[in-house]
Swiss-Prot record:
Keyword Acetylation: yes
Family matches, as Pfam families: HEAT, HEAT_EZ, IBN_N
Official protein name in the record: Importin-4
Role noted for this protein: Nuclear transport receptor that mediates nuclear import of proteins, such as histones, RPS3A, TNP2 and VDR. Serves as receptor for nuclear localization signals (NLS) in cargo substrates. Is thought to mediate docking of the importin/substrate complex to the nuclear pore complex (NPC) through binding to nucleoporin and the complex is subsequently translocated through the pore by an energy requiring, Ran-dependent mechanism.
MF (Gene Ontology): nuclear import signal receptor activity; nuclear localization sequence binding; small GTPase binding
Residues in Importin N-terminal domain copies: 24-90
PROSITE patterns: IMPORTIN_B_NT
SUPFAM superfamilies to which the protein is assigned, alphabetical: ARM repeat
Amino acid sequence: MEPAGLEQILKELLLPDTERIRRATEQLQTILRDPAALPALFDLLATATDSQIRQFAAVLTRRRLNNRWRRLAPEQRESLKSLVLTALQKETVHSVSVSLAQLSATIFRKEGLQGWPQFMNLLQHSTHSSHSPEKEVGLLLLSVVVSSQPEAFHAHQHELLQLLNETLSDVSFPGVLFYSLRTLTAIARYVRPDDVSLARMLVPKVVTALRTLIPLDEVKACEALEALDEMLETELPIINPHLSEVLTFCLEVAKNVALGEPLRVRVLCCLTFLVKVKSKALLKNRLVPPLLHALFPLMAAEPPMGQLDPEDQDSDDDDLEIGLMGETPKHFAVQVVDMLALHLPPEKLCPHVMPMLEEALRSEDPYQRKAGFLVLAVLSDGAGDHIRQRLLYPLLQIVCKGLDDPSQIVRNAALFALGQFSENLQPHISSYSEEVMPLLLSYLKSVPMGNTHHLAKACYALENFVENLGPKVQPYLPELMECMLQPLKNPSKARTKELAVSAIGAIATAAQDSLLPYFPTIMDLLREFLLTGHEDFHLVQIQSLETLGVLARALGESMKPLAEECCQLGLGLCIHIDDPDVRRCTYSLFAALSGLMGEGLGPYLPQITTLMLLSLRSTEGIVPQYDGISSFLLFDDDSEAEEEEELMDEDMEEEGDDSEISGYSVENAFFDEKEDTCTALGEISMNTCVAFLPFMDATFDEVYKLLECPHMNVRKSAYEALGQFCCALHKASQRSSSDPSSSPVLQTSLARVMPAYMQAVKVERERPVVMAVLESLTGVLRTCGSLALQPPGRLSELCNVLKAVLQKKTACQDAEEDDDEDDDQAEYDAMLLEHAGEAIPVLAATAGGHAFAPFFATFLPLLLCKTKQSCTVAEKSFAVGTLAESIQGLGTASAQFVSRLFPVLLNNAREADPEVRSNAIFGLGVLAEHGGCPAQDHFPKLLGLLLPLLARERHDRVRDNICGALARVLMASPVGKTEPQVLATLLRALPLKEDMEEWLTIGHLFSFLHQNNPEQVVDVASELLRICSLILPDNRIPPDTKAALLLLLTFLAKQHTDSFHTALGSLPNDKAQELQAMMGLT
């Protein structure tokens, strides 16, 4: 085919005439099937006079070669390689140079360094050229090729860093700077430790280069900022010596209102990431105050004259109704503060932020006050524990006062803050319901039902507060339900109905069975919404599905008669409505129903799992982002015959190789769908057990693939579901066989899941994912027991992983700084350690005390160092609690650790904080129980602590733990050494008030007394009868405890009749008669 004929067709495609473009497209698709078309394209990319035709030819050539390179004759390959390099050197139009560089990258991937030495020669020559346009082309080519195949350049990292140190030194040529930064973006993550000093030299040059690019091209500057992100993300401390300079640059750009918002937002995103990965370095270099001083004016910025922030506009856009949905510098500045709260110790952040916060809230400027409430909202997320313990009431009063602010924008922010407080400060905030609920109800009634924008904000705060109230919601239930049912029964906007349906779900979560009087009305309304075909009600339908699932969980058995109808409703909607949110909410409904129906859901599982597997596999919503011109995608000209031929070709090249795709964007709804699908599958597998087995293999494989998903929440949900699958398989194997170890499916699943969990803890960068993995790991160990510790060596691997978390040596922990000078940690860090700590006692119980003891010895110093006087309350509580539960798991093997544990637990039993005291006393009790002779030596000192403490202790849980500890001491005391006054003191302190689990211990004591020395209870008969009369009607007391006490009393009645009847006489008549009847003495 002649180049001129092909060129004419390509020209037709550039005309603004739809019909001519259609005909030319058909011609082109036909021509490109002819092998002779390729040489014509080669000729055009080098010689066509029109730059658009040259670019067209380069892109089409690249797409043709993706799967056909090896089919070209060797001389054709060599000819094209030479032609492309020549064309690159001659080309003067930048867009064509980019396409030629991309074509070169495709060829390079096929040939490699060895197969194309001329390419490396050109790179070497052009990137070091003194002629700037030639150097720019060389760096363009380098950036594209290194991005395309970074592993090919690993051996040349040092030379590349040296080159970039040179090219970034001259700020005269923006193109050279831009492509130098793009190259750095591609190689930064591969920098080796011995090149750190060279990489550090680049940081000031990167900042200077960015400063040079910003006034010239903000779009390119945004793209070039990725180099900074990559340098921050590497585990090596490249940025640290220049952290102040980088921070100053970012803040300068963020504050500069003359610059475009996309660039300022992009820089604030970079700052957010910097805070996340360099929080300790920020503290060490005293950079937090200047950062906050720069952020507050950004957060308080007033929008342009006559405008409002997006979330304050009376817009019909539901996404802007609640919280921080805007894409402005203001909203991203708040996110930086959120990240500071998550990653800095509150003791270090709050002294800096609180004075600025108070000043903002006192300001006459409503935007200053708004900023104050937004900061309060995000502080409750990262510094929640600190606020709960020290600041909750005064801050809550400030927020409540904000609901009466004269400015609507401030009231909006106060509602958002109250919603965040309600979400993050549980359970403490619920104790203020008598103050908060009347305010919220009053505010809700003051908003006109038609004003859905403000109504949404009020409902957000109300829902978050109400759903955690439990029984405390009952006084407000009639008023709440009247508010919610009124717009549902009467004509109102669809959005108003959606908000009311959502609020009913939150109310149901709190009210539980108290909602039953309203249930028939609610169900009639939800049915109506779910069966309507009206398009305006689509979002009401979605919310109705979600609320139906909440009702199934809240009302339990009362909902059971409707379970099958709900199942059919959900399936019908999924089949007839193609919408990710409908599917997501339906799957959550199925999960809730599985809790009611159990294996009764079995007949529906084929349809349910088919739908869910389609959701897991779907690539819907995933949109490729192309570097080239999108119209070139029209010419994906492989005919069906060619595709079949390629499938048969043994030498077929990689299918997925498309250098035109620069990345993917995914609509959030589809990520949410995958996340909720995983969550629902995990729950359904647990609840339906054996009925789920036929679907286990397919669902397991699809969920496992999502461990590689780029979206954090999907990965988190996938890890959780895999753990639930293992637990479900264990449960099913117990049902079908007495020995779960005989289940090959369970063994295979554990063999895949446990290594995946350990790998995730080590390399996953997102803390919420790691916390979920640790929690799931603990659950699998607890359920599957020793099977989860196969093969041999697994116990050691698991202990090493947990130890890495405690030592802050995992990828998600900021541990590159020295921690010696400061033991404070962010609450987010502490939560991660707690999740690891919870696995240690479970490991001990699973492995067996004697097998675990050597590993516990390595955990012990890491836990003991968190019990020092200088540690925070949260750290002490965590460490002491972990030690206490580990002693239980170790059993008799704990005897060898008594000398190290007893003094620490004794000291912490005197702590001011009741939670620390409670944990320490529990630990002393279990150490007394299991510690054998070494522990018995400490009994006099232990009783010397516990008995006086019981007399003055005012916290119910601590008193209950003292009772449990005394019971354990009595059972563990050497025969004949039990002191009667200890037993009498213990019995006088009963019944337990809060820690009901300790009734098991008290029950064991009653059995122990009956079996070993029943005579000693004669003197305390009246106390035993008093306790019995109180606990017999209490359903919270374990039946075994009641039975053990009745046995003791029966012994008394038979062997010491006088003492028994004297004691019985001290009870009220009705109690005495009830007791005699239960003992068969009447």
